[in-house]
Amino acid sequence: MAEIGGKNMRKILSLLLALLLSACPAIAEEEEEWTLEDMLADLDAELVADIFINAEEAQSILEAQAEKSIYEADGSVLITITGTGDFTVGGDTRKSSNIWDTELKKHKGDYQFAMKNIRDILLADDLTIVNFEGTLTESTYVPSSKKNNQFLFSAPPEYVSMLTENGVEAVSLENNHVMDHGEDAYIETQTHLSNAGVVWSGGGEIGVIEVKGIQIAMLSYLCIDRYDQLWDTVPANIQAAKELYPIVIVNFHWGNELMYYPTDNQIKMGRLAVDSGADLVLGHHSHRIQPIEQYKGVYICYSLGNFCFAGNSKPSDMTSYLFQTRFRVRGEGEEQQITNEGFIIIPIRISSRADKNDFIPTVLTKESTIDSILNTLKENGRKHCEYAVDEYPLAWPATK
């Protein structure tokens, strides 16, 4: 079989495309059915033979090129992962109107508005993980344990596309709002996520997502008032996951609200997770940013603050950040080696406006505001975290 060189292959594919495009007006004017053979009828017989005889080989070449594209120049696989803070959209079914609906009307019912300023960042990475703090349900049922809660969060099931359309591939379902409408609504939320292809972990379930051929495991835990139950459970679960998957990420919902530094239990649990085999720890709940530690080479983000947060029309602090890290994978099987390539943070405000929360997370550009975020992280790291990172890079080094 004759070989098709790169230029010849491009020529053939370009020719096919040109033929298809040129046929469009004729197809529109005449309602008769056109076939590929019709379009190739006037071509040189040898060229036509090349096209059909080498179709299988061409497909193999294209598949090989697609597979090759996941590899770096040195043959390794580089995986970029983004972690965000609390994702809370929709409203409270007990109320006739809510702050989310008010903003939604301004955008003519297009609920994708909230992600418009951050979408490109999340689409550009390989995996984005958010803390999904709420439910995907139309249920109005409120458990007796929740009747006195100030906030109950739910969003219509179709809002799952806010994740899939904007580069969010995985969510944690361990927090104090996933049960706002009871067990049935919690299971319904899991179902909507799974049907949409969004990986989730929670309720004792591990989430597994494959990225560039590498399987990544995700575990999630609600620690508030549960530490005594978790000191033995968490390390056992992480160790079991690490035996099966090369990269293990652990989400914790923990700590105190409105605090800029971790509690002793957060620190103890975060380091225990690393000692047990976790490759990355992401924390939530405080609605405020907290420092990052690098413990035994593993990053522990104690709190990523808020992200897309419709729980407050004007939080006293609307600054936050996206955490982004990279893993490099070399080799396969027993020879496989995984190294962390560092991290950056992307400072954001959870609103596109400074005077109120419009639920549109937006990358910050004002230097003084960015400096304030960096100073908050560094100062609280020095005071409260033995292994706090010294610097918070804002951009990846330029590719050589």
Task: Say what each PLM segment does.
Residues M1-N8:
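Short, Lys/Arg-enriched N-terminal segments with co-localized hydrophobic residues
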Residues M9-E29:
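Sec-dependent N-terminal signal peptides of Gram-positive bacterial secreted proteins and lipoproteins
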Residues E29-K400:
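Acidic, metal/ion-coordinating pockets
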